[in-house]
Amino acid sequence: MRRRKAPVREIMPDPVYGSKVLTKFINKIMFDGKKSTAEKIIYSAMDIISSRGEKTGIDTFNEAIENIKPIIEVKSRRVGGATYQVPVEVRPVRQLSLAIRWLVDASRKRNERTMAERLANELMDASSDKGNAFKKKEDTYRMAEANKAFAHYRW
């Protein structure tokens, strides 16, 4: 473990929408340091969402992130030779990073032709409480509910 808490790096808002969350999302989508390609994918996904729905792309994005943020998760804890899945609350920074990770993973697993289409469809699904990313959150909640009896092992 580290001696001190890691300093939180300042993140610049993205140039089009001025959102720090979207910048984090762009960085998560990025492969091999190709940020301009990642930006192109995300902004074209936003255009697809805006052309399809009644909401703007950024509104749908923010709603999807809020719907996917987990409030509770399970962590493994060894007690006397047995490993228990202990439900714990999730800190806000981790909520955001989990939501972003789940959205990116779910959109990469979809079957549409381009990544922008996959991302747009996953964001629209997540904003309406559907899709694989939302299913991942529900599974996490189900695990926490099933292991509620071990909540007193929290640390």
Curated annotation (Swiss-Prot):
Function: One of the primary rRNA binding proteins, it binds directly to 16S rRNA where it nucleates assembly of the head domain of the 30S subunit. Is located at the subunit interface close to the decoding center, probably blocks exit of the E-site tRNA.
One Pfam family in the UniProt entry: Ribosomal_S7
Family: Belongs to the universal ribosomal protein uS7 family.
Gene3D superfamilies on file: Ribosomal protein S7 domain (1.10.455.10)
Transmembrane segments: none
InterPro entries reported for this sequence: Ribosomal_uS7, Ribosomal_uS7_bac/org-type, Ribosomal_uS7_CS, Ribosomal_uS7_dom, Ribosomal_uS7_dom_sf
Keyword rRNA-binding: yes
Species per Swiss-Prot/TrEMBL record: Sulfurimonas denitrificans (strain ATCC 33889 / DSM 1251) (Thiomicrospira denitrificans (strain ATCC 33889 / DSM 1251))
CDD domains: uS7_Bacteria
UniProt GO BP: translation
Top-level taxonomy: Bacteria, Pseudomonadati, Campylobacterota, Epsilonproteobacteria, Campylobacterales
Gene Ontology molecular function: rRNA binding; structural constituent of ribosome; tRNA binding
Subunit structure: Part of the 30S ribosomal subunit. Contacts proteins S9 and S11.
Gene this chain is encoded by: rpsG
Protein name as it appears in the record: Small ribosomal subunit protein uS7
UniProt keyword annotations, A-Z: Ribonucleoprotein, Ribosomal protein, RNA-binding, rRNA-binding, tRNA-binding
Keyword set includes RNA-binding: yes
Gene Ontology CC annotations of this record: small ribosomal subunit
